[in-house]
């Protein structure tokens, strides 16, 4: 099961103890820290998601600089083809309590895969600039498969009865009909095979969003969906969430085709805090499923996956 972000009901005073041996003391907390308790009781299954809302642009890692990210255009080929590629400046001046309040608002919508060493290794290889393209693609496909599997777990099932080869009646479940996938080109297409490996007959639509050369605003260049998409639940595939702008435009197009945000599940590998917040603030009913929330997004994903780096 995916894990929801949670914040404490209130911040402890400087002279109060936190009633958990695994929770950092108030002195150890930094503005913007969110404590995430994954499913499982052992120490290895616990992780901290750091929302670095106090960083100014000048103190961000070099990877967040617009030059390092390859420019500020949305979904441009020059910036890894990951689409959501405008440079990310973490908002400054927000307090921890403000982040907690926001996390309460999005807690049920932002879901994280439970962290373990396997997922952590895959994330590490994907972020490693020295990784070969073969290792990168292998690790990316594995991580995509894990995200897709959990995404399918968010879809509705219904009970059914089957008969085994020995004549035994077995009570099980099966998918309710009416699901589809939509990939945001180009990087979202990397996730299509993972979805087809799990659902051989699922229908997949596509949408292409790029920045306008004159206005630099996101513009929809192509959209093709199943004709009855308004009756389906949608797995929206986009591996890297940086600013969230591309996904916001894609959801607007889906809404124009009759899709309700409440039936959209966004499948992502990596997200920045700003990207997740922007999407949820725009569409509070959408569900975001990702493996990591981190201020540095691996925006090279699309270029390296498709061999255009």
From Swiss-Prot:
It comes from Homo sapiens. The modification Phosphoserine is found at residue 25. GO terms for biological process: female pregnancy; lactation; response to insulin; UMP biosynthetic process. Highly expressed in leukocytes, liver, spleen and thymus, with lower expression in brain, lung and skeletal muscle. This is Uracil phosphoribosyltransferase homolog. It is found in: Cytoplasm; Nucleus. Residues 13-26 have a biased composition (Polar residues). GO terms for molecular function: GTP binding; ribosylnicotinamide kinase activity; ribosylnicotinate kinase activity. Pfam families: UPRTase. Gene3D superfamilies: 3.40.50.2020. Residues 1-38 are annotated as: Disordered. Belongs to the UPRTase family. Uracil binds at residues 299-301. One of its GO terms (cellular component) is intracellular membrane-bounded organelle. Keywords: Cytoplasm, GTP-binding, Nucleotide-binding, Nucleus, Phosphoprotein. 5-phospho-alpha-D-ribose 1-diphosphate binds at residues 186, 238-246. GTP binds at residues 133, 142, 176-179, 203, 232.
């Amino acid at each position: 099961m995916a894990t929801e972000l949670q914040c404490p009901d209130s911040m402890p005073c400087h002279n109060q103890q936190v009633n958990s041996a695994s929770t950092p003391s108030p002195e150890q907390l930094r503005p913007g820290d969110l404590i995430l308790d994954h499913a499982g009781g052992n120490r290895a299954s616990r992780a901290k998601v750091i929302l670095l809302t106090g960083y100014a642009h000048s103190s961000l890692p070099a990877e967040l600089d617009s030059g390092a990210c390859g420019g500020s255009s949305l979904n441009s080929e020059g910036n890894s083809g990951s689409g959501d590629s405008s440079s990310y400046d973490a908002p400054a001046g927000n307090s921890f309590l403000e982040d907690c309040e926001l996390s309460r608002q999005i807690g049920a919508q932002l879901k994280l895969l439970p962290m373990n060493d396997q997922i952590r290794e895959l994330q590490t290889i994907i972020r490693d600039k020295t990784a070969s393209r073969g290792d990168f693609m292998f690790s990316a496909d594995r991580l995509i498969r894990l995200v897709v599997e959990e995404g399918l777990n968010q879809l509705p099932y219904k009970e059914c009865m089957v008969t085994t080869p020995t004549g035994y009646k077995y009570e099980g479940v099966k998918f309710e009909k009416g699901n589809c996938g939509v990939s945001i080109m180009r990087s979202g297409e990397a996730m299509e095979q993972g979805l087809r490996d799990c659902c051989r007959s699922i229908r997949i639509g596509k949408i292409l969003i790029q920045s306008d050369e004159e206005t630099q605003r996101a513009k929809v260049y192509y959209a093709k969906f199943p004709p009855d998409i308004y009756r389906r639940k949608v797995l929206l595939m986009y591996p890297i969430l940086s600013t969230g702008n591309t996904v916001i435009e894609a959801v607007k197009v889906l809404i124009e085709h009759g899709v309700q945000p409440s039936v959209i599940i966004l499948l992502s590998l990596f997200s920045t805090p700003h990207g997740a917040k922007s999407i949820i603030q725009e569409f509070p009913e959408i569900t975001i499923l990702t493996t990591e929330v981190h201020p540095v997004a691996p925006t090279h994903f699309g270029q390296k996956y498709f061999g255009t780096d």
